[in-house]
Amino acid sequence: MKVTDVRIRKVAAEGKMKAIVSVTFDEEFVVHDIKIIEGQNGLFIAMPSRKMGEGDFRDIAHPINSDTRSKIQDAIFAEYAIMNEEVQVQVQVTEEAL
């Protein structure tokens, strides 16, 4: 299975949740609501989940092995880095215009 598209919706700069992502596989299947979260050891992805009860969350969709998780995470972080670069360029252009 190959990641064929990553779409990122930026969330507010402050807070632990940095973005919400949709990932398309083989141009045939999409998983929405993957979150990019900043933890104590850096950024990580959280698969879409549903609250089950007293603070328990259960993944709705998730990779079955660590290799697949790494492929998904690498594709998401690569697109997130590109998006952050574009935002930085826009901020610099705006600041220079002022």
UniProtKB/Swiss-Prot annotation:
Question: Could you tell me which InterPro entries the record lists for this protein?
Answer: SpoVG, SpoVG_sf
Q: Which domain of life is it from?
A: Bacteria
Q: Does the keyword Cell cycle apply?
A: yes
Provide the alphabetized UniProt keywords.
Cell cycle, Cell division, Septation
Q: In the UniProt record, does the keyword Acyltransferase occur?
A: no
Pfam families in the record: SpoVG
Q: Which GO terms describe its biological process?
A: division septum assembly; sporulation resulting in formation of a cellular spore
Q: Spell out the family assignment given in the record's similarity comment.
A: Belongs to the SpoVG family.
Role played: Could be involved in septation.
**Name recorded for this polypeptide:** Putative septation protein SpoVG
